[in-house]
Amino acid sequence: MIGLIIVSHSKLLADGLHQLAAQMQNKQKCHIITAAGVDDETHPIGTDAVKVMEAIESLSDAEHIILLMDLGSALLSAETALDLIDPDLAEKVHLCSAPLVEGAIAITAAASGGASIDEILNEAQQALQAKQQQLNDTVTTTENEKDKHTHFSEQALTTQWVVKNPSGLHIRPAAKLATLLSGFTATLELRHGEKRADAKSMNQIALLQVRQGDKITLVAEGVDSQNAINAFNQLAQHNFGDNIATTDSKTFVGKTAYVPTVAGLAHHHAPNTELCISSYQTSENETRRATKAIEQLKTHLDSLANTLNEQYGEEIANIFRGHRLLLEDDELVESITQSIENECNTAYDAISNIFNNMSKQYQQLDDEYLQARFIDIEDLKNQLLMSISSVAQPSCAFTEPTIILSGNLGPSELLRYRNTNVVGVALANGSPYSHTCIIAAKMGLPILTDLGDNIHQIAEQTKLQLSIETRSLIVAS
C-alpha cells in the first residue's frame, strides 16, 4: 500500500484536493491523508511539522509514503518532520516536487493501479506535460523520451474503439483505463493517430488528447495480452467509467438552456397524517408487523431503483439502493425488536422512536452534507409508518403548471410529482445538500430551500413565480 500525504498551508485547499484525488483512488492500494493549516482560528494559514510527523506515523504500515508540498515552508515542515521520526520509518518517505494538484492525481491513479514506487514518482514528475502540451507550452523531453516507442512482434494483439465520451479521454476515464491495465503482465500501448502512449500511464494517455469521435487502438503483447484486450473492450463498452447519455446509434450533445424563472399555481404538499395507530397486541405480532413493513419497503425500493436507473441514471438509483441498505442494518432491526419486546411498544411506536432518534443524531452533525441525510431518515420512517397503517401514497394530477410548497420534502415524496405538471418546488426548510435537491435537479425541477415558515400562509392556487436566479419565490399581485 502507498501512502500519500498532502502538505499545504490551507486545510481547505488540502481537503478539496483530497476529495478530487479520491475520484481515482483504490483504497486497498492507496491511502490519502492531509497535514494542512495550523490550529489557530484567527490565523489558520500555515504549516506544522508536528502535524506532518503525526501524518507520517499514521501511515507507518505503508510500503512507501509520498509527501506532496505546496510552498516553501511546507517543504521545510516536511524536512523537519523527517528529522523527528524514527530513521527506519524515514527511509520509506519520499518528498515529491511534482505540482500539487496534477501530482496528487497522478500519484493516486498510478498507486491505485499497483505501479511501483519508481513508476509512481515518474508519473508525478510528468504530470504537467498534458496541460503544457494542450496550451502549446514548452515541454522539455530527452532524446530517449522521444524515441521511447515500443516495438511489437507479429504476435501482438490489437483492438480498436471509437470514443463516445463527450469530453474524450479526460482525466477520470484516463485514470480508470490506466488503473485497469496496470494489473496485466503485458506490454500495452495506446495509439491515437501517430501518437503513442504507455497504456498503463494516466499522464501519457492524457497526452494523446483523445476527443469524442476519435479512434484509438490498443496494442498488447505478453502473457496477459488477450485478457488485457478483453478488459479494455469491456471498459470501453462502458465508456471508460463515464456515465453518458446515448440514444440508439447516434449521440447528440448540446448545451443546457438555463431557465432562471418558472411560474405556476401554489399547491401545498400534504403529508400523510391519517395513519392508523393500533393498540399493542403481543411482542410477536408487533415484531411481525414491523418486519413485514421493512420487507415490503425493501422490495419497493428495489423496484423503484431499477425504474429510476432507466429514467434518471445510476446516480439517482443508488440513492434508493442506499436506503435499502440502511433497512438491512442488523443493529437497526435489533433496536426496533428490542423496543417492542422490552418497552412493550407497538410496531408503529418502535419504528417512530428509533427513526426519530436517528434523525436527531444526523441533525446534530457539523458536516452539512451528512446533516442533510436526516431528510432521508424521516422519509424512510414515514414510508414504514404508512405501510404499517396500510396507507398508500396518493396519486397527483395537475391541469395547470404547479409549484409545490412544503416544510420539507423527502426523496420518495418528491417522486410523487414526476411526470406531472409540477414545474418547481419551494421549501420552508430543507437543505440544498439533500438527496431531494439532487433528484430535483435530475428531474429538471428548480427547487428553493430555507424560505421560512411564511410560505405556509400562501393560499392554495395562488399564482407564483420561482426564480433560481434571484433565489426568491414571488407571489403575483
UniProtKB/Swiss-Prot annotation:
One of its GO terms (cellular component) is membrane. Residues 1-135 form the PTS EIIA type-4 domain. Coiled coil: none annotated. Its EC number is 2.7.1.121. The active site is at residues 9, 170, 435. Residues 269-477 are annotated as: PTS EI-like, N-terminal part. Keywords: Transferase. Homodimer. The dihydroxyacetone kinase complex is composed of a homodimer of DhaM, a homodimer of DhaK and the subunit DhaL. This is PEP-dependent dihydroxyacetone kinase, phosphoryl donor subunit DhaM. The gene is dhaM.
